[in-house]
From Swiss-Prot:
Ranges of compositional bias, category Low complexity: 1-10, 95-104
Keywords from the UniProt entry: Keratinization
Comp. bias intervals (Gly residues): 105-118
Bias type Pro residues, positions: 11-23
Superkingdom of origin organism: Eukaryota
Further facts: Belongs to the LCE cluster present on 1q21.
Protein name per UniProt: Late cornified envelope protein 1F
Job of this protein: Precursors of the cornified envelope of the stratum corneum.
Originating gene: LCE1F
Family: Belongs to the LCE family.
Amino acid sequence: MSCQQSQQQCQPPPKCTPKCPPKCPTPKCPPKCPPKCPPVSSCCSVSSGGCCGSSSGGCCSSGGGGCCSSGGGGCCLSHHRRRRSHRHRPQSSDCCSQPSAGSSCCGGGSGQHSGGCC
């Protein structure tokens, strides 16, 4: 009996699980947080001048893929385009004041609201 008792005492103790989890190698937050992006509907693409405010009537990219005010009908391409020059020159495209699916501006004036697209 004494031999069995001594064998039980000589057994190694069970391994204990660590109380604290290991530390993560990366911090939870990045050192510099990027600015929050405004909604996509109120922004133009980065190449076309950034964001456009709701009160400014909107802005259009050179390819007509920008944004206009909610009352407008979208963007239409400007008439004067140079295809030979490979420079990324900002070309003025107008916003239509009437909903239409055209690619060129029609109507009077050469402002942001030129009557619609045709």
